[in-house]
Structures are given as C-alpha cells and as structure tokens.
C-alpha cells in the first residue's frame, strides 16, 4: 500500500522527466571534468608564448590548451563539421530530411575526424616542445587528442538526446573554468575608465538579453481557426535566431582556418610558423574573424528560421498573409523578412564582440581584461540559451501525461 502511494506521487510529479535530463547532463559534465584533468603533456613541455586569442577561442568551444589534456580540442571540429554539412544540404533540405540518423552521424563523424587531425596537428606543433622522438611523440599525442575530440562529440550528442541543451553546458563549464584560471596582469586604471568599462559591459549584456527575449511576429490568417481580437495568430522569430551557437561555430571555423594555413606552411617550409597577422593581436586577424562571425551567423540564422519549410507548411495548412498569394509569393515574402531580421541580429552580435576586440588592439595593456569581458558576455549568452531550453522542457513536462496518450 505504501509503495503504491509513493509510485502514484512519482508518476504525478510533472517535472520527473526534466530532472532526469538534469541528472544526465550532470553526469556528462562530470565525465568532461574528469577527462580535462588527465594531462598528456607535462607543463614544462608546453611552449609559453603569447596565445591569449587561441586560448580564448578554444575555451569557448569546450577545449583547453593551458595544459594539454584529453579534451584539449573541445567541440570545435564537431561544430565546424555540422555547419559545413548543414550549409551543403541547405539547397536540398527535403533530401536531407529523408536521411536516417545513422547516415547523418556517419557524415558528421567522418568530417569531424578529418578536422580533428588538422587542428590537433596544429596544437602539437604550436604549443608542445619537440623531443628527439619527435615523429613517434607527435603521432601518439595526435591520436590521444583526436580520440578525445571524438569522445567529446559523442558526449555532446548524448546530452542532446537525453540531457539539456546539447553541447552548451560543456562549453559553459569550459568558459567558467577558463575565466577562473586566467591570471590577469595588474594595470593601473583610472576610476573614470573603470566605470566606463563596467557600464559598457552592462549595456552589452543588456542588448544581448534583448536580442534573446524579443520576438519578431508576423501576423497571418488561419482558415481553420478564427482569431480572437486579443489572441491573433502569428509566426514568431527571434531577433538573433543563431543565438550563442553562432559564436561557437565562428570561433571554430576561425581556428580551423588558422590551423589549415599553419599546417600548409609547415608542410611546405618544414618550419613552425608564427602567423601573427592571423590572430586577435592583429587588425587583420580580428577583421577576418568578424567577417566569419557575420557570414556564419547569418547563414546559421537562415538555417534555423527555415523559410522553405514555413512556406510549405502554410501552403499545406491553408494559412496565408493578407495581400500575399500562397506558394512562391509567400516564400519570397518570408525570405525578404528573414534576410532583414537575420542580418540585423547578426550585425548586433558582431558589433558587441568586435568593438572590444578592436579596443584591445588600441590599448594592448587592457587586452587580457577585454578578453575576460568578452568571455563574460559569451558566458551570459550561453546561460540564457540554456535557461530557455530548460523552460521548454518544463513546458512540455506539464503536458506530458496528455501527450503520452497519443505517442
């Protein structure tokens, strides 16, 4: 009798699925913490040079090169592979939707493996001192780094299926860890300058919060349900559909570009290159990154908005916009609105990230503090996305008992 009563209470508890997902995500994070503690190279064997930009970028993808460990490459190769495959299949979305999960995973894993090898080779050549057994040591370290990257991809994928927010909790933990391990230099700053910096950070965070919360609503007519005056039907898009994932992907692609150019230079000359112009310490490097952030942020936003699918759904359901013919005209109308919205949201995020990076070039003494501020903004952005995902799970948990009757 007592057991039946306990079972009834558990079955009626509306958040049980949500808490299972939280528990699974915590398990994934514990595995990530354990793997990041397994160092594969002694600290004395690491090259100490100015690589703040690379450490910043890697930490925002779940990696860590302060000390080379199993998960040093992070999720960068996987995120890059996903965006490349998504952009390739964008023109033929119907064919991509008919692919099985196994087919999609095979393509992602194969491309991730290749990108991991390129980035891993770059990390070893740039940040590890070479020994007499150079070739054997490089191959062994490369094997460990690539294996760790593939394991991280699997952990993030499992968290996407059974946990909360996919790769974002791993990246958030990596950013927090990186912020606490940074040793900021002591710089004498005037009180006025400090107040201005704090105000600018608060304003930037407030703008990011607005882009995450504000929706762009397009009202339409539903031929099945007549809208009430207080509850009109509308299609809702976020101001920045790409969210924080666009920042992670742009950093990943930028690192892939850096790694590829360094790899080609090393294969041609046989020397370890130091391409300062392709870093956050040079105007060219910052400009290239911001161009990548703008283009990839826009493309990712367009993928998420998916006006092609919206057009098909409207045509199938009989919904329409006033003064717009169904079919091709509706598609052109939605594409026009989506272009303006996605460019607007992407430009805001790029400006918020770009302005501090350019200021760090003008005031090099404050570069470490500016990188710290950028990480703080990215951390808050990730936290907002994770919170929104948790709210979505809570919303569906409330109707779980009803939906399970039909699933």
From Swiss-Prot:
Keyword rRNA-binding (UniProt): no
Keywords: Cell membrane, Membrane, Protein transport, Translocation, Transmembrane, Transmembrane helix, Transport
Gene Ontology annotations for the cellular component aspect, listed alphabetically: plasma membrane
Transmembrane region(s): 22-42, 68-88, 108-128, 136-156, 169-189, 191-211, 245-265, 280-300, 343-363, 366-386
Family: Belongs to the SecY/SEC61-alpha family. SecY2 subfamily.
A GO biological process held by the record: intracellular protein transmembrane transport
Protein name: Accessory Sec system protein translocase subunit SecY2
Subunit: Component of the accessory SecA2/SecY2 protein translocase complex required to export cell wall proteins. May form heterotrimers with SecE and SecG subunits.
Record function comment: Part of the accessory SecA2/SecY2 system specifically required for export of possible cell wall proteins. The central subunit of a protein translocation channel.
Annotated membrane topology: Multi-pass membrane protein
Species name: Staphylococcus pseudintermedius (strain ED99)
Subcellular location: Cell membrane
SUPFAM superfamilies: Preprotein translocase SecY subunit (SSF103491)
Classification via Pfam families: SecY
Gene: secY2
């Amino acid at each position: 009798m007592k057991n039946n009563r306990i079972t009834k209470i558990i079955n009626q508890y509306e958040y049980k699925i949500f808490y299972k997902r939280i528990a699974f995500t915590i398990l994934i994070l514990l595995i990530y913490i354990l793997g990041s503690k397994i160092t594969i190279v002694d600290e004395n064997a690491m090259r100490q040079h100015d690589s703040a930009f690379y450490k910043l970028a890697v930490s925002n993808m779940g990696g860590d090169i302060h000390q080379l460990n199993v998960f040093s490459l992070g999720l960068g190769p996987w995120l890059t592979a996903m965006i490349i495959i998504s952009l390739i299949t964008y023109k033929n979305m119907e064919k991509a939707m008919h692919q099985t999960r196994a087919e999609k995973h095979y393509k992602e894993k194969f491309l991730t493996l290749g990108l991991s090898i390129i980035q891993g080779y770059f990390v070893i050549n740039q940040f590890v001192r070479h020994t007499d057994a150079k070739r054997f040591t490089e191959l062994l370290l490369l094997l460990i780094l690539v294996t760790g990257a593939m394991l991280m991809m699997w952990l993030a994928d499992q968290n996407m299926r059974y946990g909360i927010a996919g790769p974002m909790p791993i990246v958030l933990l990596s950013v927090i860890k990186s912020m606490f391990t940074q040793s900021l230099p002591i710089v004498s700053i005037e009180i006025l300058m400090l107040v201005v910096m704090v105000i600018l950070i608060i304003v930037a965070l407030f703008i990011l919060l607005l882009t995450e919360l504000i929706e762009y609503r397009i009202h339409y007519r539903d031929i099945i349900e007549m809208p009430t005056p207080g509850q009109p039907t509308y299609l809702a898009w976020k101001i920045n559909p790409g969210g924080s994932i666009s920042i992670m992907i742009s950093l990943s692609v930028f690192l892939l570009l850096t790694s590829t150019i360094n790899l080609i230079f090393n294969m041609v000359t046989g020397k370890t290159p130091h391409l300062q112009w392709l870093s956050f310490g040079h105007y060219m490097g910052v400009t290239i990154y911001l161009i990548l952030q703008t283009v990839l942020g826009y493309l990712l936003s367009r993928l998420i908005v998916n006006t092609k699918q919206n057009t098909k759904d409207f045509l199938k359901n009989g919904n329409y916009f006033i003064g717009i013919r169904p079919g091709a005209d509706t598609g052109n109308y939605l594409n026009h609105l989506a272009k303006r919205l996605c460019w607007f949201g992407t430009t805001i995020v790029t400006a918020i990230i770009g302005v501090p990076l350019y200021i760090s070039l003008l005031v090099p003494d404050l570069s470490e503090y500016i990188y710290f501020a950028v990480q703080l903004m990215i951390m808050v952005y990730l936290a907002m996305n994770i919170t929104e995902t948790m709210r979505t799970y809570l919303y569906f948990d409330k109707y779980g008992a009803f939906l399970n009757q039909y699933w």
